[in-house]
């Protein structure tokens, strides 16, 4: 199951006037120039995974604006990545205090992860619940589709009607070989389901043949669908008229008997959708590779995704699928969903069944 990590805040500010006055030798324009330089250097270093360098730059920025929540959050994030958990905990708490009544949900994501590493179990649950509840609050005014008041049709064990959907692009063995392994495991774990891979021409032909040899469907996305991030391709299964139920999974995550037991519990329920959270870092409303549902609710998914992308309401391409699910799918899904949550983050969640 994908280990979903929090997003960088990336929000160093223009220096508040009161703080600039403490640096009388530096005028406001010069101060903002210095902050921008540190911010840009921090962002570049963090994107490259050089958190030691990112830390040096964001630390200098915090020295200039010590009470700014965004700067403190970025500092805590780099400390988290550097495994300086006590420092990260301190600065996340300072960032929350500096935020007043407007706390960024990402702060709770980071604190949940930090508390896990510090073995602060009760605080991990506390901040995990805040991470989930604040995201729910962010979506409360988003549009939703209607779900029929009746139960979904009973599950039929016809593998052609039940699809486990993956996106696959490129030749990286981490994704290609894991995908092939999943097709083998799915034959044993998910005999009532068929694996389907939405791919483009960057996937080696030999990989495609090996997937098909193991019973998987290989679907080449269209030229217009290619314009979307590959992370979205697997969602196209949602409006396939030949599909009755679907599961969305990550190409680099192994299917398991644990998740199958949870899926079977969903199939026996009267809920239209299913989602799972099974790690301390699972503080998003819908983990992009850990959910599923019944067909017939969402239509014209390609246009639905394009409409969301056009809004620009996401912090970066790495998490664009997560934010689409948060703002465009969750408001509908939440009306009828079975949530398996081993972390106790969701008040409506239940533990995973025995298997």
Where are these regions (language model features)?
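Short coil turns that delineate tetratricopeptide repeat
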Residues: 32, 66, 100-102, 135-136
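Start-of-helix register in tetratricopeptide repeats
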Residues: 36, 70, 103-106
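Catalytic core and acceptor-binding pocket of nucleotide-sugar-dependent glycosyltransferases
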Residues: 130, 294-355
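Active-site-proximal specificity loops/subdomain of glycosyltransferases
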Residues: 203-243
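Conserved donor-nucleotide/metal-binding helix-loop-beta segment in metal-dependent transferases, i.e.
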Residues: 257-284
């Amino acid at each position: 199951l994908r280990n979903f990590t929090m997003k960088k805040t990336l929000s160093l500010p223009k220096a508040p006037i009161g703080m600039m006055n403490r640096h009388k030798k530096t005028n406001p324009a010069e101060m903002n120039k210095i902050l921008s330089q540190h911010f840009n250097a921090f962002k570049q270093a963090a994107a490259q995974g050089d958190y030691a360098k990112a830390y040096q730059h964001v630390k200098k920025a915090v020295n200039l604006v010590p009470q700014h929540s965004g700067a403190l959050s970025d500092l805590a994030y780099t400390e988290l990545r550097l495994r300086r958990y006590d420092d990260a905990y301190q600065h996340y708490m300072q960032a929350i205090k500096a935020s007043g009544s407007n706390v960024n949900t990402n702060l709770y994501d980071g604190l949940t992860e930090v508390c896990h590493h510090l073995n602060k179990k009760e605080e991990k649950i506390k901040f995990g619940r805040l991470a989930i509840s604040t995201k729910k609050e962010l979506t409360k005014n988003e549009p939703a589709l209607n779900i029929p008041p009746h139960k979904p049709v009973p599950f039929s064990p016809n593998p052609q009607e039940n699809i486990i959907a993956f996106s696959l692009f490129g030749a990286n063995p981490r994704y290609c070989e894991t995908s092939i392994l999943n097709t083998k495991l799915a034959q044993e774990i998910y005999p009532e389901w068929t694996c389907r891979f939405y791919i483009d021409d960057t996937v080696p032909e030999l990989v495609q043949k090996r997937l098909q040899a193991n019973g998987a469907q290989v679907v080449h996305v269209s030229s217009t669908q290619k314009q979307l991030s590959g992370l979205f391709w697997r969602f196209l299964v949602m409006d396939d008229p030949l599909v009755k139920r679907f599961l969305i999974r990550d190409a680099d995550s192994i299917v398991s008997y644990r998740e199958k037991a949870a899926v079977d519990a969903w199939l026996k329920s009267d809920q239209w959708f299913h989602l799972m959270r099974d790690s301390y870092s699972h503080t998003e409303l819908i983990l992009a590779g850990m959910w599923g549902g019944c067909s017939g609710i969402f239509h014209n998914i390609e246009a639905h995704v394009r409409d969301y992308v056009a809004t620009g309401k996401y912090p970066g391409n790495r998490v664009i699928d997560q934010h689409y699910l948060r703002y465009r799918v969750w408001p509908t899904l939440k009306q009828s969903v079975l949530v398996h949550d081993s972390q106790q983050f969701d008040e409506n969640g239940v533990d995973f069944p025995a298997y």
